[in-house]
Structures are given as structure tokens and as C-alpha cells.
Amino acid sequence: MKTNYIYAVLLSLLFSTFWGCSDWTETESEDYFEYPGADYYANLRNYKQTDHQVAFGWFGNWTGLGASMVNSMMGLPDSVDFVSIWGNWRNLDEARMADKRKVKELKGTRALVCFIIQNIGDQLTPQGQTAEEYWGWDSSSAAPDNPANLAAIEKYANAICDTIDKYDYDGFDIDYEPNYGHRGPLSGNDAYMLHFIKTLGQRIGPKSGTGRLLVIDGEPQSIVSESGPYFDYFIVQAYNSTGDADLDSRLNST
């Protein structure tokens, strides 16, 4: 009887295991991911054209390659309206160009060039040349009406816009932080910054009529107030912030 009992238990376990695993052998898919259809992306693009609270971020380590999409703009959340490319915005290869083009065409997500503005020619002065040599900057005088420096500023601003045109970016994000270690001959001179922004504003920003964005981040509350109408967005960074009320105060003072 003991032997029969053991056999009965083993047989019962065998059947329960067999029937318990039978669902694994089903050949028909019962629950699987479906990619969004054309209507989803059309609605997403249309939504981003409406007046709404935008989603923004900085995007670094961009390659446009990799199965995980962590280094691709296509891997960004669908709700992101625009991003500022940090560090790897220049000399775009086909992978990054294709990634940027696809995310804009499919999701309506836009990409901006972004870097710190401190000195004339930052990020664009050719290697081996000085700002004085390449841009015609006169470092001997910071007079607001110095014709050499005003011309150098115009040349620099237009070079930024030329870069935007070359790679089909959607605008420029000025990282402006004069009170956090980045005060220079350009960023520390209100007259020069206003001339710089006005020159940019002829080709990008709300006054240009091009649809390309001009954005300022970091310390927009510190920029010369006359420049305000030339920007699409002000982005306040939380350096030394004490809380939401402090950030609101900074924004309201722009």
C-alpha cells in the first residue's frame, strides 16, 4: 500500500506539472506589444503645435547608435518637445543626422545647439587661432560702441546661425552663467550681449519668422532686460536655490 501511495502521489505531481505547463506550449500570441500606429504620431505632432506646457531637457552622449537607444534622440520620451544637445552637437555624422531627422519627422521633437557663452568665438574659433585673429576682436577696449568688437560679435552670431543651418538644427540655447564662473568679455558686457542677441534674433527666435528657437538657460534673470523679446523660452537653473518660490522669483525678474 505504501508503494502504491507513493506511485499515486508521483503520478499526481506529474499530471499537475504537465497541465500547469501546458499554457507555455500555446503557439498563438495572447499578450504582446503593439507599436503605435500612424494616428498616434500624427496626434503627437499636432499636440506639440498647440499652446501647452512644454517638456524640455539637455541631452548628452549623443551618438544616434545602439540597440538600447540610450544614446539616441529616438529613445527620448515621446512627450519631450525639444532638447538642447550638450557636447556632441558638431561635425554630425550620418547616424546622428538620421536620428535627429527621424525624431522630428515622427515625434515632432526638436533639437537645439547649446553651449556656454562667455568669450567671443566660444566653441567656434578654429584650433590654433585666437579670437583677435579670427573674429577681429579688440581686447584693448570694452567700450560699448567699439566698432571692431561689434563687428566681431556679428560675425560670431552669424557663424552660430550658419552652423544651425548646416546641420538643420531647430535653434540655439544660450547657456548664460556670468555669476557662476563664466563671466567674460562677452557675457560680462551688457551692451555686447544685447548686440549679440539682436544679431542672432535676425535669423532665429520669435522676431526672425523662421520658426527656429532662441532660448536662454542658466541665469536668464541676469541678462539685459531689453533682450527679453528676442527669446522663445527662459530656462532657470537651480543654482543655490532655496526652493520653488526662489525659482519663481528668478523667473519673474527676467
Please provide the spans of the model-predicted regions.
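Chitinase-like catalytic core of GlcNAc-active glycosidases
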Residues: 51-254
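Bacterial Sec-dependent N-terminal signal peptides
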Residues: 1-8, 12-51
